[in-house]
Each structure stands twice: as structure tokens, then as C-alpha cells.
Amino acid sequence: RRVADALHCSLEQLLSELALHHLDLVLAGQAAPRNPNLRLTSERLVDSPVEWYGPARLVGKTERDRFPQSLNDLPVLLPTGHSALRPTLDHWFEAQGLRPRIVGEFEDSALLAVFAARGLGVFPVSRLGADDVGLMRGLRLLGSSDGVKEEIHAIRSRRGQHHPLVMQVVAAARP
């Protein structure tokens, strides 16, 4: 199998590999689906509030003061529907009465941030990832999506639960 193929796969593929004991741990944005045949356990490690950032030329005092309504007037970059966060954001948009102008959808959150840093739009990121956003010049905080959180789940097979490195990763991630 090519390295590129191994780096891009669906959650279902990862869970299959986990069930076959080819992997010991999967960190995902959602819990494993209930399936007694897979014999997997999920544990929510973290939930982090979602904030919005954008380039300085798009995010001024007026946009911050009008947030979240300002999302109706700004170009918006979002994760694709494959992301666990996207349905939550779509529900939040609806609850807030927002109709954002979506100008791009990305599978890769780092690429999404690069496009924003180049001035192409505003984007959501969990507070966990906000420190990395700060490394990109010219991005400013627009606002916070009240009630929207991004989750990280540790998904393990029963055999993988006792792997020393898995135990160490999970313990380090707990609050």
C-alpha cells in the first residue's frame, strides 16, 4: 500500500483496521458507532469550544461586535461534511438564523487555515487548535460559537486497551 493511501482514509476504514488489531488506537472527532461485532470502546477525552478566526483585513471591530451575524457577510471556509464538526456547525447556523456565504470546504484543517491566512475567508477552529492558529501571521479572533464544541474520542479495541503507549496517550489527554 502506498504511503499516501495510508494517510488518507475514512473513519470506517480506521475502525476496521482497529478491529483487525492492525491499530491499537484511533483518535477521532466522534465516538465509534455502536456495533457489537467490532468490539470497540470509545472514550471522550476532550471537548473544546469552537472559535472563529480570519485575516485582519476581514476581521475588524465591526465584525467582532456583530458576531455571529457578521458570518452572513463574510466569506466562510468550512470543514467538509465528512468532518464530525460540520453537522454541529450547520445546526448552529440554523439555530442562529445564519446563512453564511461558504466559499470553500476543506478535508484538511491545516490547509483551511492557510487559505484563511491568505485572506480568503474566516473559519472555525477548536480552542485546542487556536494556539496553532496564532502561529499564522495576520489571523484574528472573530468570535466564539456558544454551545458548539469539537470533541476528541479515543477509540480502542479491547486488546489495545492495555497497550502501554495507548494507556499513556489516553491518560495524558484526560483533563
Residue spans of the language-model regions?
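Short secondary-structure boundary segments
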Residues: 30-31, 56, 126-129, 145, ...
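Central regulatory/effector-binding core of bacterial HTH transcription factors
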Residues: 1-35, 106
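Flexible hinge/capping segments at coil-to-helix
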Residues: 37-81
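Ligand-binding cleft/hinge of the Venus flytrap
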Residues: 1, 70, 86-99
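A late-sequence structural motif
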Residues: 140-175
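Short beta-strand->loop
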Residues: 40-51, 127, 135-149
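A ligand-binding cleft/hinge motif common to bilobed small-molecule-binding domains
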Residues: 27-37, 110-139
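Residues embedded in well-ordered beta-strands
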Residues: 25, 43-44, 51-53, 75, ...
